[in-house]
């Protein structure tokens, strides 16, 4: 009888051990899946790339939540900037932000030129108003510099030529999570053979052969939120010299 009791106790302990081990593996699987959740969240917008004609966004609806008022078709905001540091510890940053209102089917925004200084000096910033008609950027402000004027009128957002159809092939990224926000980040090493990298090198003066990092950042619910945001960065930085392209496409209420 004592033998049977000991045997039953042994079986119970083994079942408990397997149950605990199973729970541990379940937690690991859950944590490992965060990378896939981040990619799937980004894919909701990146699958739209390339958006060759930005006016197509007038007919596309994004994630809607309780922040949207009844009848509000929402507004898309597309953004791209290129930042490059120089030897004197200054950072030059140029780019454009465009708001496409689906209610009025109008697109307005601005091109910006910024310079940041390392020392105790406020940054310089200049905005130039633009609008878009027939998928063409129209400069509304007077610009004396012919080179700057050309850059503005010929500007293309990263989302107009980027292609992330193979996003699912990016694996083993470096994932970090801040549960307090919450915010989620994942980083991947890119190849110089990547078509997106080739496109950026052909459009910007990138003085390094270093293969960049793809950085994906999400603030808010992974399932979607009109309050949070997603930001994609392709970082070419080398030896303390910042060189990067930042892109985002967001969908928010147009009516406050």
Swiss-Prot record:
A single Gene Ontology CC term: plasma membrane
Signal sequence segment: 1-22
Covalently lipidated residues, kind S-diacylglycerol cysteine: 23
Keywords (A to Z) from UniProt: Cell membrane, Lipoprotein, Membrane, Palmitate, Signal
Domain of life: Bacteria
Pfam families in the record: DUF576
UniProt KW Transmembrane helix keyword: no
Record's subcellular location: Cell membrane
Keyword hit for Zinc-finger: no
Membrane topology: Lipid-anchor
Lipidation (N-palmitoyl cysteine): 23
Main location as per UniProt: membrane
The family this protein is said to belong to: Belongs to the staphylococcal tandem lipoprotein family.
Protein name: Uncharacterized lipoprotein SACOL0481
Species this protein is from: Staphylococcus aureus (strain COL)
Taxonomic lineage from the root: Bacteria, Bacillati, Bacillota, Bacilli, Bacillales
């Amino acid at each position: 009888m004592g033998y049977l009791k000991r045997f039953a106790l042994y079986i119970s302990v083994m079942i408990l051990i397997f149950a605990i081990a199973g729970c541990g593996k379940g937690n690991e699987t859950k944590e490992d899946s965060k990378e896939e959740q981040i990619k799937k969240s980004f894919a909701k917008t990146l699958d739209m790339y390339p958006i060759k004609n930005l006016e197509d966004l007038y007919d596309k609806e994004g994630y809607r939540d309780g922040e949207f008022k009844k009848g509000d078709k929402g507004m898309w905001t597309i953004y791209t900037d290129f930042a490059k540091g120089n030897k004197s510890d200054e950072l030059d940053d140029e780019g454009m932000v465009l708001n496409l209102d689906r209610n009025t089917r109008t697109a307005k925004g601005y091109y910006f030129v910024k310079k940041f200084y390392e020392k105790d000096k406020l940054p310089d910033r200049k905005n130039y108003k633009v609008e878009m008609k027939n998928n063409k950027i129209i400069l509304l402000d007077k610009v004396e510099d012919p080179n700057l004027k050309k850059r503005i009128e010929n500007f293309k957002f990263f989302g107009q030529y980027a292609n992330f159809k193979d996003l699912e092939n990016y694996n083993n990224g470096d994932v970090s999570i801040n549960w307090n926000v919450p915010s989620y980040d994942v980083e991947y090493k890119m190849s110089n053979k990547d078509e997106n990298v080739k496109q950026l090198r052909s459009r910007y003066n990138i003085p390094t052969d270093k293969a960049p990092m793809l950085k994906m950042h999400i603030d808010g619910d992974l399932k979607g939120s009109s309050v949070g945001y997603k930001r994609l960065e392709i970082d070419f930085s080398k030896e303390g010299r910042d060189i990067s392209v930042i892109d985002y496409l967001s969908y928010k209420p147009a009516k406050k």
